[in-house]
Amino acid sequence: MIQGVILPIMANAMPSPAQAASPAAVSLNETAASYPPLRTGLRGQYPGSFEVAHAARDGLFAGPVTATDTGEHYDLVVVGAGISGLSAALFYQRAMGPDARILIVDNHDDFGGHAKRNALQYKGQTYLGYGGTMSIETPFPYSFTATALLLDLGIRPDTYSSYLKTSRLKGLEPAVFYDRENFGKDQLVPGYHEKNWDSFFRDSPLDDETRTDLLRLHTQAINYLPDLTPDARQALLRTISYETFLQRYAHMSDGAIRFFAGKAFRNNMRVDTCPAYDAMKADAPGFNGMEVTHDTPHESAVFHFPDGNATIARLLVGRLVPSFFGTPQTAASVVMAQGNYSRLDQPGAVRIRLNSMVVRVEHTGDPTKPNDNKPVRVVYQKPDGTSDTRHAVMADNVIMACFNNIIPFIVPSLPEAQKDALKYPSKVPMQYSSVLLRNGQALRRCGTQSIYAPCSYHTRLLVDEPVDIGGYTTNPSPDRPTMIHLLRNANAPGHPRKEQNRLGRQEMLAMTFPEIEAKTRDQLQRMFGPLGFNHEQDIVGLTVNRWPHGYAYTYDTLGDAYMPAALRPHVVGRQPYGRIAIANADSTAAAFTNTAIDAAERAVQECLISRGYT
């Protein structure tokens, strides 16, 4: 439980596991009005946060944009308070000194970008969840820059095992939920793992052909491309989808392929959009007998905080605006620390201005002249479109740490080729719902810690990893409130991947919170109702984190033409423009926290070069 106190631990020092697990006895004493993580209902890119952004996209700010000058002049303005933007501000401050004046502007009511903190209250206690970015985890090692930043913030991923209490999940295993619309009956079947394939598929509501096909795929090592050399097999697998491989070469029935309908590969590639080669690298079934080699990823260390990577964002804000927490925080103490949002935009070296949508960034001088020292004008207004009042500040540098797609409409003077490149990616829509259950009895009765639901509204259910850190305890117990996470990545099967992202985004924006809540309650009732679950009594909190513009777009061998690295859209799009630089995950074509941090460091270096400092 979260007690909302700041523990007296020295900065930059992680406590021992024994210290981290020590209990506390007070409750979070904030309200949703003053503490955004407590706001429930529809969050993420919620109504009121994006209307002006859509107006900019639709050309409302195509001409000159008038605004009242606030008289403020900053060394740096950062557009976007996600991890990349916050990291850029800290890197810039280190380079220019503690007196550098920095303003961070964001259109949401909370900082962190996709790394949002969810806090749900029940009976005087508060329970944490993550609203987007889940963990420190990548299929490749963190760079020196990203690793050094984590260490400076007091985060040591190699210590995670000290806080992880896997014994609390003993007896719980993955399960699959089959829905009656697609499989004939609602049934939750545990035992979804390789040690149990025979009994698992025997207990599943599948016809004989589907069951036989899935058993063959999961248990037999068959070379489905016997007439090709290993190199030719690899080449072919790069050019076909996993669905095509299953249909054409593994001869799976339609029922067997339906089993994979909700399977999400990296960055939400689905069975019909994921290259078969990538599915093989992700250990999808069907490739054990193919004798095709592939690179083994050198994965980074893993660390999961109860609020996901919102902890990183909170530690960054604590460094930039020390009064936010009042005292220095460690990676452990910050888990329960209360931040004072009223202090974010007070006079000081760094200010964070939330609920403000930037609609224009423009040079007042000539961006093509290296020695032009005229400032950049930044205009912003309320993001919901209820007021036409706009304000302008001046900055010696600007870092665009928002989505690539919106930048051409905010910085219309960019070269046309660069604007086209920035418009190229189609961000992946995602929806993370944090659901607080009155207790964990239903999960224990069915013996599951995660559920795959191939054709349901939410395709994944996860019980959070059990950790003890900073006095906060995650324990999926039958006798205490339990946080679960539901994942949905809206898509439109049968279309190219980018089009699926666009159609999924439209669907998400069209749905209201009551509609999402009804689908959530219906699905959980159908999953757990036979185990005594009653959604009206047992669901005691719900926060839906809707991200129509979610994960950064990544290239694949089906939907993107090969081209030299220097010509790829994300590289062309991120080029500095006078005193303006770009830092975000989009600029790395990778949906990872560490690449967002790397982009921040690059953008700061480009800013310093633009001012003749390096």
Give, region by region, the residue ranges found by the protein language model:
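N-terminal export signals
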Residues: 1-23
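Conserved flavin/dinucleotide-binding core of flavoenzymes
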Residues: 24-65, 119, 436, 442-614
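Glycine-rich active-site loop/strand segments that organize a redox cofactor
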Residues: 28-42, 112-144, 224, 231, ...
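N-terminal Rossmann-like FAD-binding beta1-loop-alpha1 element of flavoenzymes
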Residues: 75-103
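Glycine-rich FAD pyrophosphate-binding loop
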Residues: 93-119
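Dinucleotide-binding Rossmann-like beta1-alpha1 core, especially the glycine-rich loop
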Residues: 123-213
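Active-site/ligand-binding neighborhood in enzyme catalytic cores
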Residues: 219-357, 364-370
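Mid-domain catalytic core of redox enzymes
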Residues: 346, 350-485, 489
